[in-house]
Regions:
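Glycine- and aromatic-enriched mobile tails/lids
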Residues: 1-114
């Protein structure tokens, strides 16, 4: 696996992947289906591209490392600023992102303090 596709993330890698994804989205506009099975495959491909974009943009938004989520440019866990959920929504056809505080007091298991 090339290092640029490893589990280690950085803003530069996110930007490169998002540019590649834009090219895929452009090509996907020209998909065609000859039958119902092909149409289903086209819809699945569109859904995969959408999921990939949501995941990349949300990951790019998180400016910390946490558990398996390892960012080279933000190597430390930051509970003060990033003990949050990232919420992705469709608002009037646009992908939007915001964060919500994780209500840790409601859970028996607490995040580590570093």
């Amino acid at each position: 696996c090339p290092v640029e596709n490893s589990i280690y993330m950085s803003q530069h890698r996110f930007d490169v992947l998002l540019r590649k994804l834009e090219k895929v989205k452009e090509k996907a506009k020209y998909m065609k289906a000859d039958d119902l099975h092909g149409l289903l495959t086209c819809h699945e491909a569109d859904a995969m591209v959408l999921c990939c974009e949501m995941q990349l943009r949300a990951a790019s938004m998180r400016k910390e490392s946490r558990g398996w989520f390892i960012r080279e440019d933000y190597p430390d866990m930051d509970n003060e600023n990033w003990l949050k959920w990232i919420i992705v929504q469709n608002k009037e056809g646009e992908m939007t992102f915001h964060t919500e505080r994780v209500p840790v007091e409601e859970y028996d298991v607490q995040p580590p303090k570093y």
